[in-house]
């Protein structure tokens, strides 16, 4: 069964491939394979809206089942920021390091507060080219570190200290992060839908023989 990972981010693609390969025989490809592809601008207010927007566009473009995700980092002390601006906090053309730098600058304005709590919200969607949508949500709670720690991961990983581990996402071994992150938890919740779609695909194939 052919399935598209609607992302060109190497880390996300790798994490999702590991998940899919555990579930069955898939012909997996991603937007990394299509550098000329232009995804739609993310205009959603929530991870669910963005995941569906990205996934539906890609599913209809490539005419195959597609997995798409979106995450937002929410910091109550900053009024919910970066929130829907998580991917563009320091500007549309800024990189991950720029976003982390701006976040730390904003946190320094709150030195008198002890509340550095934060959480990720994530939605992962499985979408057919005909608009059938399955979705799963997950979140992870933690705190924002005072400085970047760790060298792995991406995005806000060097700043997000996950509860129970006392380490940032970027300090955790990739194999561990791929089990405990918000995206990993959402993928696990999506698993029954993926298995059902695969089973139906295999059944349809047998009936056509």
Swiss-Prot record:
The keyword Cytoplasm does not apply. The active site is at residue 70. CDD domains: HAM1. Mg(2+) binds at residue 70. Its EC number is 3.6.1.66. Substrate binds at residues 7-12, 71, 154-157, 177, 182-183. Disulfide bonds: none annotated. Its cofactor is Mg(2+). Keywords: Hydrolase, Magnesium, Metal-binding, Nucleotide metabolism, Nucleotide-binding. Binds 1 Mg(2+) ion per subunit. It holds the Pfam family Ham1p_like. InterPro entries: dITP/XTP_pyrophosphatase (IPR020922), ITPase-like_fam (IPR029001), RdgB/HAM1 (IPR002637). GO terms for molecular function: dITP diphosphatase activity; ITP diphosphatase activity; metal ion binding; nucleoside triphosphate diphosphatase activity; nucleotide binding; ribonucleoside triphosphate phosphatase activity; XTP diphosphatase activity. GO terms for cellular component: cytoplasm; cytosol. Homodimer. Pyrophosphatase that catalyzes the hydrolysis of nucleoside triphosphates to their monophosphate derivatives, with a high preference for the non-canonical purine nucleotides XTP (xanthosine triphosphate), dITP (deoxyinosine triphosphate) and ITP. Seems to function as a house-cleaning enzyme that removes non-canonical purine nucleotides from the nucleotide pool, thus preventing their incorporation into DNA/RNA and avoiding chromosomal lesions. Belongs to the HAM1 NTPase family. This is dITP/XTP pyrophosphatase. It comes from Chlamydia trachomatis serovar D (strain ATCC VR-885 / DSM 19411 / UW-3/Cx).
């Amino acid at each position: 069964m052919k399935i598209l990972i609607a992302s060109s981010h190497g880390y996300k693609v790798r994490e999702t491939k590991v998940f899919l390969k555990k579930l069955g025989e898939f012909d997996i490809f991603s937007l990394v394979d299509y550098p000329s592809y232009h995804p739609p601008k993310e205009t959603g207010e929530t991870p669910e809206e963005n995941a569906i927007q990205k996934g539906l566009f890609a599913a209809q473009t490539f005419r195959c089942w597609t997995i798409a995700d979106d995450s937002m980092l929410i910091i109550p002390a900053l009024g919910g920021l970066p929130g829907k601006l998580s991917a563009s906090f320091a500007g549309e053309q800024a990189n991950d390091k720029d976003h982390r730098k701006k976040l730390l600058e904003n946190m320094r304005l709150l030195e008198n507060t002890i509340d550095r709590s934060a959480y990720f919200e994530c939605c992962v969607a499985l979408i057919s080219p005909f608009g059938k949508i399955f979705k799963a949500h997950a979140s992870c709670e933690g705190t924002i570190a005072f400085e970047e720690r760790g060298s792995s991961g991406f995005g806000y990983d060097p700043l997000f200290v996950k509860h129970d581990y006392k380490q940032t996402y970027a300090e955790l071994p990739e194999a561990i992060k791929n089990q405990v992150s918000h995206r990993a938890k959402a993928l696990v919740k999506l698993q029954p839908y993926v298995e059902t779609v695969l089973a139906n695909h295999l059944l349809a194939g047998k009936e056509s023989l």
